[in-house]
């Protein structure tokens, strides 16, 4: 079981200070790499449809998956034809790019990809090479906008809009890896189109074995439960359950962990509540104690207004370019 080092989220720490020279070196490498793309020394794949990148500059969960679900479905509801590309982290398929379906195996395409596909009404392709994923998507589906899930640092994929998500831990101690949680310097946020705070709303709690069996949130008050989370920021999940009144026995696992039945061998009969990403990998277990806690992204109205105005203009501009207008 792994979690982010505590010193990443402390303003001052001995270990953070010791590692700061390595962070400085890391920043230099990141800036050089990005600069090579900016001046054309490394190739950027460009496409005839808008590419919207959703990501973050920190290691760990920032609510990307619920946000991408909301964005894909909202685009579809507004008459667009979205598609999603992702790395498919944790997937071990022999062939990529690979189209994700509702019946895809998380072991093959990754847990986040399977969760996304079960909750969005649009095509999705996974591949470590994001450009190859977009080519495969556009070759096989008629999409007019592509969402790049967790692609902020993948500069080989051209982009028209960038959305950076920030979670409740913000930027931690403000240092880059390994002294802090930042993948890129915090100044990177000045270059994206939107910075959106992570906000999740509880949706429902249902039993994995029988999804029709649900627990009302009021029933959680004073109830002792095992909370199991193999996500980037498990503390946020535990805090949500505590806010609803539950007495939480926390079990943080490493991100993208694949569970075994013995992981749930607790010496009591308390309910076991999982995140949606974890539940995807536990449906094969015949255990009536297993429940899933589903959430929805809450997105600011101002972002919605600005984003859909911009994306509409970009689509019209690209269409005019294709037609030579």
From Swiss-Prot:
InterPro entries: LpxK (IPR003758), P-loop_NTPase (IPR027417)
E.C. numbers: 2.7.1.130
Transmembrane segments: none
Keywords: ATP-binding, Kinase, Lipid A biosynthesis, Lipid biosynthesis, Lipid metabolism, Nucleotide-binding, Transferase
Pathway(s) it belongs to: Glycolipid biosynthesis; lipid IV(A) biosynthesis; lipid IV(A) from (3R)-3-hydroxytetradecanoyl-[acyl-carrier-protein] and UDP-N-acetyl-alpha-D-glucosamine: step 6/6
Gene Ontology BP annotations: lipid A biosynthetic process; lipopolysaccharide core region biosynthetic process
GO cellular component, one term: plasma membrane
Annotated positions binding ATP: 58-65
Enzyme class: transferase
A Pfam entry, by short name: LpxK
CDD domains reported for this sequence: SIMIBI (cd01983)
Residues making up the signal peptide according to the UniProt record: none
Function of the molecule: Transfers the gamma-phosphate of ATP to the 4'-position of a tetraacyldisaccharide 1-phosphate intermediate (termed DS-1-P) to form tetraacyldisaccharide 1,4'-bis-phosphate (lipid IVA).
Family of the protein in this entry: Belongs to the LpxK family.
The protein's name: Tetraacyldisaccharide 4'-kinase
Record organism: Coxiella burnetii (strain RSA 331 / Henzerling II)
Organism taxonomic ancestry: Bacteria, Pseudomonadati, Pseudomonadota, Gammaproteobacteria, Legionellales
């Amino acid at each position: 079981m792994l979690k982010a080092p505590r010193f990443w989220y402390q303003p001052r720490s001995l270990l953070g200070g010791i590692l700061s020279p390595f962070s400085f070196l890391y920043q230099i490498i990141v800036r050089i790499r990005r600069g090579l793309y900016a001046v054309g020394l490394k190739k950027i794949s460009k496409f005839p449809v808008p590419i919207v990148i959703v990501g973050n500059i920190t290691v760990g969960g920032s609510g990307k998956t619920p946000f991408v679900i909301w964005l894909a479905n909202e685009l579809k509801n507004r008459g667009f034809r979205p598609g999603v590309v992702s790395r498919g982290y944790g997937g071990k398929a022999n062939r990529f790019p690979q189209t994700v379906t509702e019946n895809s195996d998380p072991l093959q395409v990754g847990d986040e990809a399977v969760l996304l596909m079960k909750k969005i009404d649009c095509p999705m392709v996974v591949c470590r090479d994001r450009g190859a994923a977009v080519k495969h998507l556009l070759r096989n589906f008629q999409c007019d906008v592509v969402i790049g899930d967790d692609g902020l640092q993948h500069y080989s994929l051209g982009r028209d809009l960038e959305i950076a998500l920030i979670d409740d831990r913000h930027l931690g101690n403000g240092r880059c890896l390994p002294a802090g949680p930042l993948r890129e310097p915090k100044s990177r946020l000045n270059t994206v189109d939107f910075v959106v705070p992570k906000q999740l709303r509880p949706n429902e709690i249902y039993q994995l074995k029988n999804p029709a069996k649900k627990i009302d949130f009021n029933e959680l008050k004073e109830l002792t439960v095992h909370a199991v989370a193999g996500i980037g920021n498990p503390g946020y999940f535990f805090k949500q359950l505590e806010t609803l009144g539950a007495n939480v026995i926390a079990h943080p696992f490493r991100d993208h962990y694949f569970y075994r039945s013995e992981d749930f061998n607790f010496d009591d009969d308390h309910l076991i509540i999982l995140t949606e990403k974890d539940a995807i990998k536990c449906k094969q277990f015949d255990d009536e104690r297993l429940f899933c806690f589903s959430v929805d992204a809450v997105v600011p109205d101002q972002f919605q207004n600005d984003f859909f105005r911009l994306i509409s203009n970009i689509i019209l501009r690209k269409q005019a370019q294709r037609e030579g207008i």
